[in-house]
Regions:
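Short, aromatic- and glycine-rich surface loops/edge beta-strands on solvent-exposed regions
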Residues: 2-4, 44-66, 339, 371-395, ...
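Preference for solvent-exposed, low-hydrophobicity sequence contexts
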Residues: 337-363, 379-405
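Extended acidic/polar, glycine-enriched regions
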Residues: 8-82
């Protein structure tokens, strides 16, 4: 029998579990081990734990306890505030179908539960926004179309005046089924690779067919929006340089509380393209650090100012997509792209430093350029022009009230 003693600082809780075990124990064989589920309410920052084993027959051993000195181990449990996800249903009008993604209660509960199972959070506050529509045709591998819709989600986040902690996740269904759309390969999602923790870049876009593959895609894109690059598996581009486990493996045992499933350390990290997937210790820690930064309030002290956003894509001129409120950067943020601001007559308004935010799709990025009064365009030292438009052309449009999909 196993006894687990947990001292929360205000109470002592004892948990017990018994089993008959013969032979050596192995982590990957649950029947060979004793397993207890610890209630979340006792995992406080001040909690400490001790474990002892008692042989039901026989004399037992004084060494069958942890810590062996008879003391307690401080858990150093951390609270990080959880995450806020706003799902944006996008009605697909390009083929005349008016097709909606699956944002049913069951699908959203499954997405929330999978985030809770994989990410270092104890709370996922997920809501479904009113739907919008698009007439943009999205082919399975059309990076330009995906980039256009992604910009629309980002602009929507800005026009909604979303809370700083909210991550917008656009979902859409460009074909009748995932198999029909992706049978010969496809882009399944795209998001800014938000390594700079820019408030305006907390959004992403994914297919919304409601199955487990699509949930993994959505969570993968939320990972990018939290600053996570690709794990090195499956021919990804721009993989994490310091990823510690060969082949993009998780490197540690994983556990899914929803079904008591264990994931072998050879399982692949969810930020790669290989299967099966779970979350690595490496990604888990870094996601926690980002969630703490966002939800813990460290971003509240940022000084915000208007920034122009330009979409950069292969084989096309930079396009202005709108204005966002973003933090004022300085040299400590890393490399800046210096640009000359000019008015509509070409007169010099001074230098500004722009930030480039890559997306998960190679070659596609956003450029954040601080606004300058009367600026009509910005010019790089090499002569490339970034022209400000009076208004951006969005790929997303509001739906009539009866098409809304709110929960």
């Amino acid at each position: 029998m196993a006894f687990v003693r947990i001292d929360t600082g205000s109470e002592v809780r004892t948990l017990m579990q018994s089993a008959t075990i013969s032979g050596a124990s192995s982590v990957g064989t649950p029947s060979s081990t004793l397993n207890l589920e610890i209630p979340r309410d006792v995992l406080t920052p001040s909690a400490s734990i001790s474990v002892s084993l008692l042989e039901m027959s026989g004399t037992g051993s004084d060494l069958a306890r942890f810590p062996r000195d008879g003391g307690e181990l401080a858990l150093d449990a951390l609270q990080n505030g959880g995450i806020d996800v706003v799902v944006v249903p996008i009605r697909y009008d390009a083929d005349g179908s008016g097709r909606m993604p699956d944002t049913s209660e069951g699908a959203m509960n499954a997405l929330r539960d999978q985030l809770l199972a994989m990410w270092p959070v104890s709370d996922v506050r997920l809501r479904v926004r009113e739907s919008v529509s698009t007439s943009t045709t999205v082919a399975p591998t059309s990076g330009q179309a995906w980039g256009s819709l992604l910009d629309g989600v980002g602009n929507l986040r800005q026009s909604d005046r979303a809370a700083g902690s909210e991550y917008y996740l656009g979902l859409f269904a460009p074909a009748a089924s995932f198999r029909e759309f992706c049978g010969r390969g496809c882009i399944a999602g795209i998001a800014p690779l938000n390594q700079g923790n820019y408030q305006s870049q907390r959004y992403g876009l994914a297919l919304g067919y409601g199955d487990e593959d699509n949930r993994f895609s959505a969570i993968h894109e939320l990972g990018h929006a939290h600053g996570r690059p690709h794990a090195p598996c499956g021919g990804v581009s721009g993989s994490e340089p310091g990823y510690p486990h060969a082949g993009g493996a998780t490197g540690v045992w994983g556990y899914d509380f929803r079904n008591d499933r264990l994931y072998d350390p050879s399982t692949k990290d969810f930020m790669g393209y290989c299967e099966p997937q779970w979350v690595s210790d490496f990604a888990y820690l870094r996601l926690h650090q980002r969630v703490v930064s966002v939800a813990g309030g460290s971003t509240l002290s940022w000084r915000l100012a208007p920034h122009h956003v330009f979409r950069v894509a292969p084989f096309t001129a930079p396009s202005w997509t709108g204005l966002v409120e973003e933090r004022v950067t300085d040299a400590s943020d890393g490399e800046l792209t210096m640009m000359k601001a000019r008015d509509r007559f070409g007169r010099d308004l001074g230098w500004v430093g722009a930030r480039r935010v890559e997306t998960s799709l190679p070659g596609f990025a956003s450029l954040l350029i601080p606004d300058v009064e009367d600026a009509a365009f910005f010019e790089t030292p090499s002569g490339q022009i970034y022209r400000v438009a009076s208004s951006g052309e969005s790929a997303l449009h509001p739906n009539p009230p009866d098409d809304s999909n709110v929960r």
